[in-house]
Amino acid sequence: MGFITKAIPLALAAASVINGAEILETRAGVQTLADKYIVVMNDGMTDKDFDSHRSWVNRTHRRRLVRRGAKAMTGMKHTYRFPTGMKGYSGHFDEQMINEIAKRADVKYIERDARVQINAIEMQDNVPSWGLARVGSKEPGGTTYYYDSSAGQGVTAYVIDTGTDIKHEEFSGRATWGGNFVDDIDMDCNGHGTHVSGTVAGTKFGVAKKANVVGVKVLDCDGSGSNSGVIMGMEFATNDAKKKGAGKAVANMSLGGAFSQASNDAAAAIAQGGVFLAVAAGNDNVDAAMASPASEPSICTVAASTEQDGKASFSNYGQVVDVYAPGDGITSAKPGGGSQVLSGTSMASPHVAGLAAYLIGTGKSGGPQLCDTIKNMAIDVITNPGAGTTGKLINNGSGK
């Protein structure tokens, strides 16, 4: 079998290429999932051609099971159809089947599925929060959150995370369950997603206090999931937002992993679908260009600041960071009622998603271009933001 070499994304190691379909390898040390892959189709593929390809995969996989006893591979699992055109699927295939798929001229690339996780790093109960006051003030140290009374009303926020406690008093009936793409437990059994949702749109803790929340579960009780499952959640949010009017929708992803072209492409598809997407930069104190989906340039990537307007010690940085937002010692909702304090870029990102919902509620245009509006409104106050990193901290423009 002949192999040729082609250029591949910088963050990925050299890999096999067959008839134009790249089989991408993740970096050393990344926790890949054995025999699980994400297959992304060529740009512009029609639904008819995609259905034909999927039928071929299923037929070929079944024949392999019968004729060759291809282990206990389960074949195709998830199918992705973003409204802006990205199509693909994930599944459990042996090496020979993946090589057969890679021979197809209609395949753009194949990527090994890998683990992703939440980006929160510590927890402390029942201490005061400061993030809201900082978003509504030009100076640090405030205790009052100033905001327009529209407060994101009529805007839907998709929180792609561990799920959301939709019955929590913070949401006053404004939260609904969207879907579960990781397990069979339709609740937030971790707490991370509820905390994030509270920062986006909680009555007490939220930036956009009247926005609606849709909980999309892609991470399990341990705060862990896979790129393939996360992409399913992203696809759901994009398609659901299209039904409801994408211009009045925002999404938040306080999660991430090592660089993944498929994850980045899915994030770009959300933006292309007209949905504003905020993503946590990551908590490894490294360049966020190494992480996904934080490294996707068409979304809004958020680093974490401290109460003293410094870079949080854990926060990733770099040119892909669009803005800073409060992320150290943030109080928000926890499942079952009450509150808890978490730190991380996971806590910074929902401040930006909430601000996006808030600004749409005041009449500003939504979609990915809203990130530019947020950057233009931000104040340049972050000390030591990191090499090549913006020093801008978000502000809601209240004038206080």
UniProtKB/Swiss-Prot annotation:
GO MF annotation list: serine-type endopeptidase activity
Recorded superkingdom: Eukaryota
Residues linked to a glycan: 252, 396
EC nos: 3.4.21.-
Subcellular location per the Swiss-Prot or TrEMBL entry: Secreted
Enzyme class, first EC level, given as a word: hydrolase
Residues of the Peptidase S8 domain: 129-400
Catalytic residue list: 161, 192, 346
Signal peptide stretch: 1-20
UniProt keyword annotation of Ribonucleoprotein present: no
Protein family per UniProt: Belongs to the peptidase S8 family.
The protein, known as: Subtilisin-like protease 7
Organism: Arthroderma gypseum (strain ATCC MYA-4604 / CBS 118893)
Gene for this chain: SUB7
